[in-house]
Amino acid sequence: MMLEPRPAARTLLFRVAERVYGCDIDSVREIIPYRRATRLPGAPPWVQGLINLRGTIVTVLDLGMRLDPARAPVRDGSIIMATQGTRVVGVAVDEVMDVQSIVAESIDTRADVGPQGLVSGLGHLHDGVVVLVSIHVLVTQVLL
């Protein structure tokens, strides 16, 4: 009996510093050019602040600073508008690269890296390893 292969995950690839990350494309609503956010007093350093996106106030997070607090904040690049239910959160990244399918068998979910389950696994592509980020966990951390 032959097992059917699991479907490939469509993944948005993006760069933060020198590392390539990815997230499930289904959690991405849109991508906009980077814009400066209004800082929130008392917010953690990885929360850049708020922007007004066509009349909707959106919290913008700095993924690089969330993963490495010593890193300089993103000041250029793009903001990935990610959705979790009815919530929209912006994720500031240095560069949005591509959308690729990652075969489920090439994803290692045992990877224990990143803060509080933020990294959901490592995906293996022909030209390297992609750190897969859980948008659900990232958004949940903001809501707490």
Question: Which residue ranges define each predicted feature?
Answer:
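An acidic, low-aromatic, low-complexity terminal/linker signal
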Residues: M1-L144
